[in-house]
A protein has these predicted regions:
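A glycine-rich helix N-cap at a beta->alpha junction
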Residues: 92-98
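Short, aromatic/basic amphipathic alpha-helical patches
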Residues: 82-91
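Glycine/small-residue-rich loop that forms an oxyanion/phosphate-binding "nest" at active or ligand-binding sites
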Residues: 97, 103-106
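Glycine-rich phosphate-binding loops that contact phosphosugars or nucleotide phosphates
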Residues: 116
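Single conserved hydrophobic/aromatic residue that forms the stacking wall/gate
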Residues: 1-12, 191-192
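Boundary-proximal intrinsically disordered activation/regulatory segments immediately upstream
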Residues: 8, 13-78
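RNA substrate-binding interface of SAM-dependent RNA methyltransferases
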Residues: 66, 122-191
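Alpha-helix capping/helix-boundary segments
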Residues: 59-61, 80-81, 100-102, 169-170
Length: 193
């Protein structure tokens, strides 16, 4: 491991940084992730997090990488061995965070699973999905991200080709929905109708 100093922070290798201050601007977008109402507002259309989605856990992150979603940032604890992540793309920032930073981000000083920020994939059109899909699920007013995650997980298990979700349904890429689906949401074609 190559260690060099960058300003007052330690850079463990290119694009991997040790963050000790919760006020560090590099982690500002992640502070308060445990406040789900605020996070959901930020993730809605027009919010600052709308072009991104958050994946938590090794399984979820690896599944997102398998279908070639672009990993932008990886937040890990001081002792996390990121060799468990199948591949870390070039240009991905890795923030190895102290307990105080992790507590500001998640509400807990310890982080068992990594947190990744990905670029949200483009949506297919209704015509593209319905033309090639044999089995489609339509959600109606599934507002709870946990329930949406279970819908995605079950849809993948039953070989569903596409999931259409109505305007009253929550985003299947909400952090909790992605986690509950165990990353199965990435194997489905989705469209907001």
């Amino acid at each position: 491991i190559c260690v060099r100093l960058v300003g007052s922070e330690m850079c463990i290798r290119d694009r991997e940084y040790f963050i000790t201050n919760p006020e560090d601007e590099r982690v500002a977008d992640f502070i308060g992730l445990s406040n789900h109402k605020l996070r959901q507002l930020r993730e809605k259309d027009g919010g600052d997090m709308a072009p991104y989605f958050i994946g938590e856990g090794i399984i979820v992150i690896n599944r997102a990488l398998t279908v070639e979603h672009k990993l932008l940032t990886l937040i890990i604890s001081e002792k996390f061995d990121h060799s468990q992540i199948t591949t870390t793309p070039k240009g991905c920032n890795i923030f190895r965070c102290s307990p105080s930073v992790l507590e500001a981000i998640t509400g807990r000083p310890n982080l068992k699973d990594p947190i990744g920020t990905f670029l949200r994939p483009p949506q297919s059109t209704f015509e593209e999905l319905t033309h090639k899909a044999n089995l489609i699920v339509l959600t109606e007013s599934v507002q709870n991200p946990t329930n949406m995650g279970m819908v995605m997980r079950n849809a993948a298990a039953f070989g569903v080709d596409a999931v259409l979700f109505d305007p009253q349904s929550c985003d299947p890429f909400y952090r909790r929905a992605v986690r509950v689906s165990m990353g199965q949401v990435f194997s489905l074609s989705l469209i907001h109708i």
